[in-house]
Amino acid sequence: MAADDKVVLGLIHAEDDPESVLICYLLGVEALRAGKQALMWLTKDGIKVATDGFAETVNVPNAPSIADLHAEYVEKGGRFYACPVCVKTRGMEDAVWTKGAEVKGAPSLYEFTEEYCYALAEAIG
């Protein structure tokens, strides 16, 4: 697969902003449907998204189900990288991670992107 067939989605939010979580899943699922590889790069509170069962705990009224989007994302091979520093600072070293999730830092992100990728990030703020 070519490097430009990879999409990185940055997310810093979890239950504090379910709409950002929803948007990240919508973008990721659409990328996978288009035949691209999708990776959620999770930092700050966003790492919670990669914990087992999280997707069932949040929703956005009148929007697609985050749990259903999560299931499709994982089924189609979507991946999650949880920032190791963020995992440590939140005391989540013993967390149970969802399928496709790994605690990986910047070097692994750079390896995934190789020379080029589409990068989609939620605004920080």
Please name every model-derived segment.
Residues M1-D4:
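Basic/polar N-terminal segments that are highly enriched at the extreme N-terminus
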Residues V8-L22, F54:
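Short, glycine-rich nucleotide/cofactor-binding loops
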Residues G46-V60:
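N-terminal beta-loop-helix "entrance" segment that forms/cooperates
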Residues R90, K104-G125:
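Short terminal interaction segments
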Residues A95-E102:
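Short, electropositive alpha-helical surface patch
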